[in-house]
């Protein structure tokens, strides 16, 4: 199962705690990439946030990984389930 997650930081919440959470995101994302759970990570140019593509075995696993993100409590998320674009068969 693949999910595209667009996340955006609410700049009104900027604090020391948020800055530390943002600082932990690269390590968290790199670990998930090494485990094969995140296929790609992007920063939004001119926007406080990013886009990640998750590749997980279940919806429950996706929710767990998203909930463990250091910025989980500070960000707004838009989640899109993805499907491969295979040509029709038959």
Task: Give each language-model segment a name.
Residues 1-90:
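Conserved, structured core segments of small domains
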């Amino acid at each position: 199962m693949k999910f595209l997650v667009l996340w955006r930081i609410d700049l009104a919440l900027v604090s020391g705690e948020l800055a530390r959470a943002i600082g932990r995101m690269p390590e968290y994302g790199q670990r998930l990439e090494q485990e094969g759970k995140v296929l790609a990570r992007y920063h939004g140019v001119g926007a406080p946030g990013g886009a990640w593509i998750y590749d997980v075995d279940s919806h429950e696993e996706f929710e767990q990984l998203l909930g463990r993100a250091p910025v989980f409590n500070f960000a707004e998320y838009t989640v899109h389930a993805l499907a491969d674009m295979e040509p029709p068969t038959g």
